């Protein structure tokens, strides 16, 4: 199967899985709003964020290590890989549940035991699903994502609407959904046949830890780079400004969803191709097309943003549309940095990933503190954009030095110029229809003149080999 077709095919499968899950989550919002008080939902959301924050720390990001190593491990060695991690995570899971049980007797209002159960279930789902994805069970991985949210949704309905279990029901639903998805993956892939403590290999485990350990602080640095702006706006300006800022970021996050879906298939493809003599051609082509797609999406968003705010968003947040063009650029840079990160993880150079993320996070905090007093929440958006741009430049420099990527600087500069022209249209023209028409014309011209986009699209349609 041609590498480009495989990349796009996997992306399509992951898109179905991700969008299906997002749809179920969207449908659940009214259920939560009618069955949980604002206090209960606030507590439930806080516990959920805590679980997602603790998952990399408690697991040492070993599920990412399993994914990377399983992609190029010989079939006879894969049982050692998965069994070694299962052994370690079994111990850490037991410790988590014991701690949760003990603290539950003291702080029962915060549901420590159920939160620990949610954390353990989330870790095991991450491990089992990533191993399935790495060993070729892409469709099983996608179905498991949908199944997880479906089971969680049905359980939420029963526990919240029928039995009125509140926060406890909310957490139990997550646990049941994750466990159901894990059971499905184990059954569909027969992975359980590869798991045995007799395959435990301490040397293999140490190799995994060396790879995964830098990804733990990287996760927290990335979180700081992405979320610290909200904290500073809240403390330095106020909750109203933070609300406008948060709302302005909702629509640009659509680009982030595109990047997340694509990165799931890109991780597989880049590991398979990086040892190839012509890997630089593949990485360069994908990088150029991906950047083009991101800027196309960005241009559409900034030219549609004003009418979208008028139609979909409460008038109290209307000023947020003026922030969007900066936030879209930040999301584009953040998405590009994720794709570049994958090239480093494919080469098992995770320490560089951590260092570049850390530099961006430090710069983001310093710029945010300096700019907010000068230009308000625009300063936070500008700081976010600059910090992600620096991360991209640092990662690009390293990848270019390794001969894995050739950057068409003229094309990237053109994308930026065209983007800023499109972003200026809503500020210069009052007629939304005219702005949208200009935006569509710009996108059509880019698609027609971009040779890589045209080549990949034409060959895929004609089912020809891509070169």
Give the predicted meaning of each segment.
Residues 426-467:
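Membrane-proximal transmembrane or re-entrant/amphipathic helices at the cytosolic face
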Residues 70-87, 244-357:
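Specific pore-lining/lateral-gate transmembrane helices of multi-pass inner-membrane transport
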Residues 3-63, 97, 149-153, 157, ...:
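Signature of the first transmembrane helix
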Residues 1-3, 139, 167, 171-173, ...:
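Interhelical loop/hinge segments that connect adjacent transmembrane helices in multipass membrane
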Residues 113, 143-191, 359-363, 377-398, ...:
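Hydrophobic alpha-helical transmembrane segments
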Residues 10-25, 148, 173-181, 185-189, ...:
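Transmembrane helical elements of multi-pass membrane transporters/channels
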Residues 9-21, 46-104, 109-110, 277-297, ...:
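Membrane-water interface segments that mark the loop-to-transmembrane alpha-helix transition
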Residues 11-21, 79-80, 116-122, 132-157, ...:
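Alpha-helical transmembrane segments of multi-pass membrane transporters/permeases
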């Amino acid at each position: 199967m041609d590498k480009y077709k495989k990349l796009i095919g996997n992306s399509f499968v992951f898109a179905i899985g991700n969008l299906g899950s997002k749809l179920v989550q969207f449908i659940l919002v009214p259920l939560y709003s009618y069955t949980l008080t604002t206090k209960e939902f606030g507590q439930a959301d806080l516990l959920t964020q805590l679980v997602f924050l603790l998952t990399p720390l408690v697991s040492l990001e070993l599920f990412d290590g399993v994914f990377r190593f399983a992609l190029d491990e010989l079939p006879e060695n894969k049982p050692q890989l998965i069994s070694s991690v299962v052994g370690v995570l079994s111990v850490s899971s037991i410790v988590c549940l014991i701690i949760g049980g003990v603290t539950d007797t003291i702080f029962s209002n915060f549901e420590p035991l159920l939160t620990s159960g949610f954390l353990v279930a989330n870790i095991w789902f991450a491990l089992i699903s990533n191993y399935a994805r790495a060993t070729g069970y892409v469709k099983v991985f996608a179905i498991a994502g949908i199944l997880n949210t479906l089971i969680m949704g049905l359980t939420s309905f029963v526990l919240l609407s029928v039995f009125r279990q509140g926060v406890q029901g909310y957490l139990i639903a997550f646990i049941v959904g994750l466990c159901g998805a894990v059971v499905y993956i184990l059954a569909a892939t027969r992975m359980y046949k590869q798991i045995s403590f007799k395959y435990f290999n301490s040397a293999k485990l140490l190799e995994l830890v060396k790879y995964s350990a830098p990804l733990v602080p990287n996760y927290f640095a990335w979180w700081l780079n992405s979320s610290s702006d909200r904290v500073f706006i809240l403390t330095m300006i106020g909750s109203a400004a933070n609300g406008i800022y948060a709302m302005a970021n909702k629509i640009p996050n659509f680009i982030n969803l595109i990047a997340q879906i694509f990165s799931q298939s890109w991780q597989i493809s880049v590991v398979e191709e990086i040892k190839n003599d012509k890997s630089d051609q593949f990485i360069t082509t994908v990088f150029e097309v991906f950047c083009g797609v991101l800027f196309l999406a960005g241009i559409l968003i900034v030219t549609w943003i004003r009418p979208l705010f008028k139609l979909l968003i409460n008038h109290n947040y209307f000023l947020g549309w003026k922030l969007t063009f900066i936030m879209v650029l930040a999301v584009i840079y953040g998405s590009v940095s994720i794709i570049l990160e994958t090239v480093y993880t494919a080469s098992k150079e995770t320490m560089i990933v951590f260092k570049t993320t850390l530099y961006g996070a430090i710069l983001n905090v310093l710029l945010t503190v300096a700019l907010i007093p000068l230009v308000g929440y625009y300063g936070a958006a500008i700081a976010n954009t600059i910090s992600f741009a620096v991360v991209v430049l640092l990662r690009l420099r390293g990848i270019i030095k390794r001969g894995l990527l050739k950057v068409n600087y003229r094309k990237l500069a053109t994308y930026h110029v065209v983007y800023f022209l499109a972003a200026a249209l809503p500020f210069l023209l009052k007629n939304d229809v005219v702005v949208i028409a200009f935006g569509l014309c710009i996108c059509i011209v880019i698609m027609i003149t971009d040779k890589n986009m045209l080549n990949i699209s034409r060959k895929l349609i004609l089912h020809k080999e891509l070169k």
